[in-house]
């Protein structure tokens, strides 16, 4: 159901005098939520490291269309010019498909959880290929902010990806459910092959990295 209230994303300056009035970057008239309802997961929102751009997950639909569609996308808001673009649809400054005309959009499944590279040149995120299939494989995708090129890093890896972290600008780490366990994996985009780093009869729920050290939550 829809109660007529929606979660929006605001950006505002915080100075000595407190928080100044913020800008609703979703749009005051937008009748949808950021982060996505019903979980409102803050992991769907990510500042770049320079603090100049904000990536977020959004599904700009209303009513029944919002309820039945899995076509969420990653949007990037630029603080300098106030413009937003959708990185999951063909990028040429305007949409290349018309939903009203029955055209099928590119990447029609869930696209969520953006993670910026340390140099802010790339965004890693999770993507599902098929529309309407919430149990579809969760693929690890990489978007190049300069060329707008998109790369499926786990195309030949038959497991879901989750909890993505960057190691420098050239390697990504993540958790994958493998044969009733959860293991830590890594991949260098230029090498193109996933390496399963941990092994054993356990579930790794979360992990963090510092240099050559990894701390993991294991059960």
Q: PLM features: residue spans?
A:
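A flexible loop/linker signature enriched in serine peptidases of the S9 family
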Residues: 1-10, 27-42, 57-75, 86-112, ...
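Blade/loop signatures of beta-propeller domains
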Residues: 5-21
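Short loop/turn segments that connect beta-strands within beta-propeller blades
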Residues: 14-17, 78-82, 144-148, 188-192
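A structural motif specific to WD40 beta-propellers
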Residues: 20-23, 85, 151, 195
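Residue-level detector of Asp-centered blade-edge/turn motifs that repeat once per structural unit
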Residues: 49-50, 118-119, 167-169, 209-211
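Hydrophobic beta-strand positions that form the internal "hydrophobic ladder"
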Residues: 54, 120-124, 153, 171-174, ...
